């Protein structure tokens, strides 16, 4: 096994919740990995615009897995896209909106724009905080392009709604994506990683990946070297033997030893 690709979830993994900028160390590590012929992949539910801004100093050294695998970018070009069936996306969006007791706001993701159905509960501020392109809509039918992901933002937390939505939309890979988000998508991170590996002729055994939540499981399950964050839920820490508080700690040792 020779690591050729390193994938990392962002929020809750490489970027702790509430932080807006990455540490300088990760940029130095990505540059050194690139010099050694190892590609770094931010693997996130965020859109491309947000990820490219976040990784601006090293963006040309990265391949970007966006929208949980719904869209893949390399060298500023979309190299793969996995949209949801339109009728299913609209049905899910309407369900998340109407069955969240007035406590949820809905985001429908296009290739590089977030379409927001908001109630003034905080979603808009969060989307502005991470730097997404966005547009306010009032109905899912207003989205003028293919939809890659449908999410609900629950401003009081996901706990009361996980059992309501996750089993119901299992066909759309419904999963908790953070303290306030539940995501649905036909794609998932493993589809994105497989697309990257196929395009770049990389064996899955030669991939290292980091994650902290249930929407990272599909990615962690297929790579040769998966790491779960120390702050992840107990079932995830039990599932994966490799734990770390920070991806940078693992990468620092990896670069020393290789």
Where are these regions (language model features)?
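Hydrophobic packing residues within well-ordered alpha-helices of enzyme cores
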Residues: 51-55, 162, 219, 236
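Mg2+-dependent phosphoryl-transfer enzymes with acidic/Ser/Thr/Gly-rich catalytic loops
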Residues: 1-5, 23, 182-258
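Active-site phosphate-binding/coordination module
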Residues: 21-122
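Asp-based phosphoryl-transfer active-site loop
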Residues: 4-19, 220
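Conserved acidic, metal-coordinating active-site core of Asp-based
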Residues: 99-210, 214-219, 231
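Short, structured coil segments at secondary-structure junctions
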Residues: 57-60, 68, 167-170, 222-223, ...
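Short active-site oxyanion
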Residues: 37-41, 60-62, 148-150, 205-207, ...
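Short hydrophobic/aromatic-enriched beta-strand-loop microsegments
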Residues: 61-67, 82, 126-128, 174-175, ...
């Amino acid at each position: 096994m020779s690591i050729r690709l390193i994938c990392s979830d962002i929020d809750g993994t490489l970027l702790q919740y509430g932080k807006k900028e990455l540490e300088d160390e990760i940029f130095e590590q990505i540059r050194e990995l690139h010099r050694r012929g190892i590609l770094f992949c931010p693997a996130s539910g965020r859109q491309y615009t947000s990820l490219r801004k976040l990784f601006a100093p090293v963006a040309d050294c990265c391949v970007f897995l966006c929208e949980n695998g719904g869209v893949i970018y390399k060298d500023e070009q979309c190299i793969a896209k996995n949209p949801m069936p339109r009728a299913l996306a609209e049905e899910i969006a309407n369900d998340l909106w109407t069955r969240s007791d007035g406590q949820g706001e809905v985001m429908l993701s296009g290739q590089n724009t977030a379409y927001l159905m908001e109630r003034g509960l905080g979603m808009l501020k969060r989307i502005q905080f991470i730097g997404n392109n966005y547009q306010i809509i009032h109905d899912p039918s207003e989205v003028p392009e293919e939809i890659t992901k449908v999410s609900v933002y629950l401003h009081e937390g996901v706990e009361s709604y996980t059992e309501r939505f996750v089993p119901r939309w299992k066909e759309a890979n419904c999963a908790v994506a953070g303290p306030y988000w539940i995501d649905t998508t036909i794609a998932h991170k493993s589809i994105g990683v497989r697309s990257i590996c196929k395009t770049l002729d990389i064996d899955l055994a030669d991939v290292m990946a980091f994650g902290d939540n249930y929407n990272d499981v599909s990615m962690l399950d297929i790579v040769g070297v998966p790491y779960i964050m120390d702050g992840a839920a107990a079932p995830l820490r039990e599932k994966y033997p490799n734990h770390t508080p920070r991806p940078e700690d693992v990468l620092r040792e990896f670069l020393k030893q290789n």
